[in-house]
Amino acid sequence: MRERESFMTEEFRSGFVTLVGRPNAGKSTLINAVVGHKVAITSNTAQTTRHRFRAIVTREDMQMIMVDTPGMHKPHDALGEELNTSAIKAMEDVDVVAFLVDASKPVGTGDEWVARQVREVRGARKILVITKADLVSKETAIQQLEAARALGTWDDEVVLSSKN
């Protein structure tokens, strides 16, 4: 018990971070990179993540519970609707919603739809994350950032590659 008390200081922070985006936006890959090893399944096949998945990251001054969600998309069947519902519910009662946009694919109507869902979230910080920057030129990554920036109001923005 004493160890826990000394661990939980005023400087210690903790919270829930939900990752959302279109299928194959890099949500599971980002979780694996932050955790430091493969804990989430990754695949080029859309809808590999079918259930919300939580990964706990603990550092000296913080603990973050990252919530991986199914890719959000225009549903064509009941499964698609259920996956979207799961992702939308994962944005409830969290501290941060990270909206991931793939730098290698043009921002489109799917991203616009996901951004609308993120805009509906109240009480959470919203972070725009441009992923897969290693697959495009710096100029393209900046263009993607600008296009995605127009989809909402963001508390923070980051362009990254989870691979390196």
State where each predicted segment sits.
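Canonical P-loop GTPase G-domain recognition
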Residues: A124-R125, D134-N164
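Conserved G1/Walker A P-loop phosphate-binding module
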Residues: R2-V96, V101
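Structural signature of beta-strand start/N-cap positions in the alpha/beta core
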Residues: V96, R125-I127
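Conserved nucleotide-binding/hydrolysis micro-motifs of P-loop NTPases
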Residues: A46-T48, P70-H73, A103-V107, A133-V136, ...
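Amphipathic helical hotspot of TIR/SEFIR-family domains
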Residues: G108-E120
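P-loop/Walker A NTP-binding module and the surrounding RecA-like catalytic core of P-loop NTPases
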Residues: A25-T29, T109-G110, V136-E139
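Charged helix-capping and loop-helix junction motifs
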Residues: E81-L83, E112-W113, I142-L145
